[in-house]
Amino acid sequence: MDYRYNLNLQYHLIPDRMLVNMNNDFRYVSNETRDTVADRFLKKDYSGLKSNISGMISSVALQNKWFQGRLTSVLTGRHYYYRLGGKTVNLAYPGDAVPAETHKSDQYWGYSLALKYDLSSHWLMKFALEHNFRLPRYEEALGDRVTTLTSTELKAEQANNYNLGIMFDRYYNANSRLQFESNGYIMQVKNMMYLTSVVGYSKYQNLGEALLYGVDGEIKWDIDRNWFVSFNATWQKSLD
């Protein structure tokens, strides 16, 4: 069973200047194993093992306009909740293949700040910083009992992101438009979730930290309503 919903509410505190946005995103996945072929091969009955995972991200964002609307700021706070429960079994050699009861939950706090400043009618600058998390998905934490092992000890992936960019956007007529955008970014990632190989199986594990930084740029020219030309380039480097 896979159940999910997303609720979003927006309220204008000051018309055309300040608004607050509240969002709640929830997902619950449960599964009951039933594989008679595998049970006969392993000479054990593992059918009926139930496990579930749920994750919820709640956020509140405050958007404000300053200096006659030339500067826009968005400040966001986030709460992450993660829960894992049920029975799992480790089928990898030399595991004992005995079902184990697992119940764990974690919560995290994140935030972000985004700024956009209109330099002129065609040019703008933007900046963003973010401290966020990525919660483990069902297949990452609980596997599939076929090719991917369970990984109930898996932690949420944590990232600190920084971005600085500039953008040009101009219409020359109703169908002709020129756009240019360039960004520089830094990403610091901790507890990265990687799919690794374990004795004939695969398993998701947290593998340390990484630093990723780079720049990218893109130019797009809409010649008319039927034709356009674009070019983009990216340079990046990662350090483990």
State what each model feature region is.
Residues 1-94, 107-108, 118, 128-130, ...:
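Face-selective signature of the C-terminal outer-membrane beta-barrel domain
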Residues 28-39, 81-92, 103, 121-163, ...:
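Surface-exposed extracellular loop regions of Gram-negative outer-membrane beta-barrel proteins
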Residues 168-170, 223:
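Beta-strand C-termini and the immediately following turn/loop, strongest in propeller blades
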Residues 3-7, 54-60, 109-113, 125, ...:
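Hydrophobic, lipid-facing positions within transmembrane beta-strands of outer-membrane proteins
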Residues 179-188, 205-240:
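Gram-negative outer-membrane beta-barrel transporters
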Residues 1-2, 134, 224:
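Short acidic-glycine motifs
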Residues 116-118, 219:
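Membrane translocator/pore-forming domains, dominated by Gram-negative outer-membrane beta-barrels
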Residues 1, 6-8, 40-50, 92-102, ...:
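Extracellular loop and loop/strand-boundary signature of outer-membrane beta-barrel proteins
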